[in-house]
């Protein structure tokens, strides 16, 4: 198939293109930077330069590629600072709203049969009831103020994509990325790894918040499966082992040669990081990958973050 990947040079876009090429697909990779043309060629993709917030430029790039499938992996996420979360995610929120609209319009004009978009699982689900959520569970109706606009952008993307009745619209709720090129990776050194080594990523309270992770290569392989035979709807793309912070954070510190994380009370975490840090440390729900494994026939290379942290950080 002809596959058009927007956000092609990001942490997920790069391994995704490699895997698509290995599967025999003809890939066009969209970037807004002229300087990344050669990188896309090296990955095996035909480069297309366009700004995702320019509807005419996106339309031209998609029309020229004539894809069967569009993959929306657009983000613009910098260094994570919970105190300035909305500011830091403002550009990504525009890509999840305006950028989504532009890609959908361009895809409709050429009649793509599938439209696969990046969504997000880690702090999106309602923080009540069971500790592991499926795609049928509701998203958070009262998120911390720091992420309210970002969660609304995620909800907008999912509604727009899965509600497009002219194509097979698929939203992939990825877990927390780790591995090469991510913030939890060693090549290059990710900012969260730097924080852990500097003991600036403490364990707050009892660390009962449950996180779901996914290795970046496994995220790419699940995306390939969705591109090839996914059906309309939402899929959690996470590993098999949701885990509380009290379990995974010390293991990650050990894996990267750091001292055990400091422990701080929740009131200090709230004071320095705001309500979001308290939620992430004590209230998050994990995600189930049962649907993705059943319907996509997908099996992660790293079923557990334990193995991934030990062998897959890069």
Predicted segments, located by residue:
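Conserved Rossmann-fold NAD(P)-dependent oxidoreductase catalytic core, especially the SDR/UDP-sugar
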Residues: 80, 84-146
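Conserved beta-loop-beta element that borders a ligand/cofactor-binding pocket
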Residues: 114, 119-120, 156-180
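Amphipathic terminal alpha-helices
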Residues: 303-314
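NAD(P)H-binding glycine-rich loop region in Rossmannoid oxidoreductase-like domains
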Residues: 32-98, 102
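A conserved pocket-lining segment of Rossmann-fold NAD(P)-dependent short-chain dehydrogenase/reductase
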Residues: 140-146, 188-214
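Glycine/proline-rich active-site loop of Rossmann-fold NAD(P)-dependent oxidoreductases
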Residues: 127-129, 155, 167, 178-191, ...
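N-terminal Rossmann NAD(P)H-binding glycine-rich loop of SDR-like oxidoreductase domains
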Residues: 3-25
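Mid/C-terminal beta-alpha module of Rossmann-like enzyme folds, strongest
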Residues: 2, 15-18, 220-276
């Amino acid at each position: 198939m002809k596959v058009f990947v927007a956000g092609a040079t990001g942490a997920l876009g790069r391994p995704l293109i490699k895997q698509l090429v290995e599967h025999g697909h003809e890939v066009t990779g969209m970037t807004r930077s002229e300087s990344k043309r050669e990188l896309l060629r090296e990955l095996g993709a035909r480069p297309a330069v366009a700004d995702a917030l320019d509807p005419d430029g996106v339309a031209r790039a998609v029309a020229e590629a004539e894809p069967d499938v569009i993959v929306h992996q657009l983000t613009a996420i910098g260094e994570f600072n919970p105190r300035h979360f909305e500011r830091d995610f403002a550009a990504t929120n525009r890509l999840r709203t305006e950028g989504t609209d532009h890609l959908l319009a361009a895809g409709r004009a050429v009649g793509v049969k599938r439209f696969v978009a990046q969504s997000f699982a880690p702090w999106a689900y309602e923080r009540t009831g069971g500790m592991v959520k499926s795609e049928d569970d509701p998203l958070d109706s009262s998120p911390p103020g720091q992420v309210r606009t970002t969660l609304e952008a995620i909800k907008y993307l999912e509604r727009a994509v899965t509600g497009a009745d002219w194509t097979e619209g698929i939203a992939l709720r990825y877990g927390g990325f780790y591995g090469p090129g991510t913030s939890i990776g060693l090549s290059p050194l990710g900012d969260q790894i730097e924080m852990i080594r500097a003991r600036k990523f403490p364990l707050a309270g009892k660390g009962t918040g449950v996180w779901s992770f996914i290795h970046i290569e496994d995220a790419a392989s699940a995306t390939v499966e969705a591109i090839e035979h996914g059906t309309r709807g939402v899929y959690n793309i996470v590993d098999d082992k949701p885990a509380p912070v009290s379990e995974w954070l010390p293991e990650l510190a050990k894996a990267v040669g750091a001292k055990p994380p400091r422990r701080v009370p929740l009131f200090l975490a709230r004071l320095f990081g705001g309500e979001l840090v308290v939620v992430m440390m004590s209230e998050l729900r994990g995600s189930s990958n049962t649907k993705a494994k059943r319907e996509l026939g997908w099996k992660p290379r790293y079923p557990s973050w334990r193995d991934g942290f030990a062998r897959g950080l890069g």
